[in-house]
Amino acid sequence: MQKICSADLVKVSKKLEEFMQYCQKLKAQDTYLIVNRKSPMLAEATHTAAENCGLNVKEIDLKANKPYKNFPSKLIKLLRQETPKAGIGLFDYHQNPEWNLTEVGARIELLHQTIEQVPISWAHSPGITIDMALNGPIQCDYKKMAFDAEHILQQLQNLKKLRITAPGGTDIEVEVGKHVKFDTDCIIVPPGVYGTPGKFGNLPVGEVWSQKGRVINVVNRETGNEESQHYPMKQVANGRLVCDVTAGGYKGKINPEKPIIAQFINGFLVDLKCEDRNLDSIKEDIITSQKKYGLPSVLEEVGIGLNEKARITGNMLEDEKIRGTCHLAIGNVRCHVDLLVNKPAITVYYNNGTTKEVIRNGTFIL
């Protein structure tokens, strides 16, 4: 178990108070739910922060010693029938790193089929660690982060497309259709950007992203039964993505000599290669979803990091927040794999015919 001394507990709690104030915009007497998945010390720090903000706190522990395929019905029932004003899910996988990938499906279902369907502000922390809280991105200036995110979102309005290149070999264009909007986890206030009652974002905060999905009925080929599942709407992308830093669901830094290389045509994933056998589980997860539900994998998300306190750690929850980085995600049913691009150049093309370079070699130039 990761431990924290009393002085550090105060340090973390103070920052979580800022998060609740500036990002979730909570007030005294609001209700707050803490979901603790093997993160007792951070749950304690969050509980202290919530009480210091005058919130009414409830806590649910997810104690299973194996990965969840679906989270307990008592959690879903509480969220749907006694919806708190806000909450947080703390998922600490440092003792079982492989669970981060194997619980993705349950987390996707929780977020899109419960959290987004009720009026709640939800902080989502898959893979959170005490080190992030003490020494990393949770120690950011939340007021400044919210301001910066709003400014950058203004630069990402009325887009036609993005072009992303990087020294590692990434060269990809992404069309930004009218159905896709950019959002941020620096301000987690419902409703969602697409009008959903609830809104979620990560803690640690620190990105803007474009992503959209919908719940569809699809046949599970393994059981023959029809299921309601969240499936991403593709973003029309053409080109090559080279991930040479960090990949979602995998703990550890990627060997830049053996990167993940993904090829997209019209938004569909048409090829995925990697010489590092340690990363086979990522490819297997994508292939498993394709076979199980018979649907293609697509480019689901484009994200840009904003957090100056974030570091390269090999943990995607933190690494994708590094200021000046870019990440793109492959998505399918119960499958979401973020792939980080370091030191990108990003050029935006607007509908009025003008262009603007937003990032050059990993540095914002707005």
Regions found by a protein language model. Give the residues of each.
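Active-site lining segments that contact anionic ligands and/or coordinate catalytic metals
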Residues: 238, 257-259, 266, 297-301, ...
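Active-site bordering "gate/hinge" segments
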Residues: 1-240, 248, 350, 355-366
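Short, glycine-/Ser/Thr-/acidic-enriched flexible segments
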Residues: 39, 94-96, 169, 179, ...
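Intrinsically disordered terminal and processing segments
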Residues: 325-366
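Dual-mode signal for accessory low-complexity, basic/Gly-rich regions
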Residues: 255, 271-330
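Glycine-rich, charged/polar anion/phosphate-binding loops
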Residues: 149, 158-160, 224-228, 244-251, ...
